[in-house]
Each structure stands twice: as C-alpha cells, then as structure tokens.
Amino acid sequence: MESLSLSHHFLIAMPGMGDPLFAKSLVYLCEHGEHGAMGLIINKPSGIAMAQLFDQIDLPLDDEDTRTGLVYFGGPVQPDRGFVLHQPAGNWQSSLMVTDDIALTTSKDVLVAVSEGKKPEQLLISLGYAGWSAGQLEKEIADNGWLTVPAEPSIVFDLPYEERYDAAMALLGFDPSLLSSDVGHA
C-alpha cells in the first residue's frame, strides 16, 4: 500500500498542543515520505529582521521593503541554518521542489539574488526547520496533535503571519473552537 504524502500540506497544531515550540503553529510541509517529514513553521517570527540576517552573512540589502521583512523561526532543527521557501521555483544550486512552482532552497545563491534585487517574486526566509523521523508525524497526527489540509500559497506568501493559523483553520470548513484536545474512541 502506498502511503499518502503530505508534502505541500499545512500541519495545524491542535488547540492544547503540549509542546510550547509548536503551540498554535502552522507548518508548511516541504517533504513527507517513508523516511520522515520536514517543514517550516510559517507563523512565528524569529525576532530577526532581514536586514540583520543579511548583515550577519555580509550581503548588502538595499531594498527597504525587504530590509524590514521578517525572518521566521522555522523549527528547532538546525536553528542556525537558513531555509528559503519561494515561488517561482527558479534555478538555484540546492533546491527541493515542493510543487512545480514552489521550492525550498538552502544554498546561498538565492540570498545573493535577494541582495542584488533579483529575488523570487515571493519568499519566506526561516532559520531552522521542523523535522520528524519515519512514522513520527503519522503517530502525532493519529494522537490528535495535528490537523492537515492542502496548503494554499496565498496563506504562506500573502497574509501577515498573525492571520496564517486562522486562515489555514478556515480551510478545514469548521469552527476550531469545537475541537477537543482529548483523545478517545467512539
């Protein structure tokens, strides 16, 4: 039996998520397969502005809108490493194609392009990522830790971070206040 891939899906933390790192988190899943899963938390700013990040990596950044943009806390794994989620996908040295139009890039060339004003149309930069070993995410979903729904790029790239969690919840089509964090069997 072939397992269902949740790549290009949102993971929505259930109300009552016990882990404070993931409480009220919205994760964009970039990869999901038999070896595990990885994604980026897309609604938690890291407290670092793009200008600070680019200063740290010695790249100029003159575009004021980009300078004031937020860098996100992508998750607890490799928190000192940058991950750039963007569309269109483009042609970068180290990219994971999530969809035909969305990629996750970890190579510095995409940051150099941002510095030079040649950035992808839409991007989200995070430090760190969220990762799950084989079967771990499936268990967390079965234990009512996460809700899943196909991702909408407009939520990732167009909405303010404060609105992303509720917008993803709205994709489910029901009132999240009706959810219980209690696990049980009917």
UniProtKB/Swiss-Prot annotation:
Transmembrane segments: none annotated. It comes from the Bacteria. It holds the Pfam family DUF179. GO terms for cellular component: cytosol. InterPro entries: AlgH-like (IPR003774). Belongs to the UPF0301 (AlgH) family. This is UPF0301 protein CV_3909. It comes from Chromobacterium violaceum (strain ATCC 12472 / DSM 30191 / JCM 1249 / CCUG 213 / NBRC 12614 / NCIMB 9131 / NCTC 9757 / MK).
